[in-house]
Amino acid sequence: VGPPAPEELKLLEPFRGQVPDDVFGEPYMPPVSDGSGQDRALLRKAVQLLNDAGYIVKDGKRLLPNGEPFKLEFLVDEPSLQPHHAPYIKNLGTLGIEASLRVVDPVQYRARVEDFDFDMTIERFSMSATPGDGMRPFFSSQSAATKGSYNLAGIASPAIDALIEKIIGADNRADLTVACRAFDRVFRAGRYWVPQWYRTTHPIAYWDQFGHPAKPPRYAQGVGAPENWWSDPNKAAKAEQAK
């Protein structure tokens, strides 16, 4: 929160004019709706932003600056994802944007995604608790030009490339934190991803034969942090009897 600290500014200043101005002020925060699915205040703001950018409405249809209709296709491989997209598509329609959902089989989906042949799609990515060279496949300019990479948004930013290298080359935790915060400001200001939905719980099934820490590590990996479980002999004996 707040403007960049002096240490962050040192990393960001070389890219002033190449990144959005809000990188140097309060960090960008995605809008928060009223939860109704049709937040009129946000829709009015969206209309204003589109109009200001030259995306006008004619005969009820939103047009691109070149006069062509504004069309947007969401590509998914699971019919079960349709309810998650329906409110988004409905609101885009309210704005005059011709949005649609295309469900394809997993093979075709994977082929199209790896070839970057889509307008928008949904993905869930897991990141390391300590950022490092694993960021390149997701955010670097090189990965944007590599078919099959995780950089589905096609992020190609010299500023992001440089900050990734600062993160990888950090000599200590303090420098790593500064570089990550600078990266976060640039990434968020780019509006590359749209947060969509999440589940507050993940159901898993297992025999009651394990011990668990009273408080799981904050950034533990995996559902329920199974790498922090241990076999409890007493529980295991009871579970074996129940099998």
Where are each of the predicted segments found?
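The substrate-binding groove and active-site-proximal loops of carbohydrate-active enzymes
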Residues: D34-G35
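Immediate post-signal peptide segment of exported/extracytoplasmic ligand-binding proteins
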Residues: L43-E73
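Short alpha-helix C-terminal cap/hinge motif
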Residues: Y88-A99
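Surface-exposed patches in mature extracellular/periplasmic domains of secreted proteins
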Residues: K58-L64, S100-V103, D175, A179, ...
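Short helix-initiation/N-cap motifs at beta->coil->alpha
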Residues: L101-A111
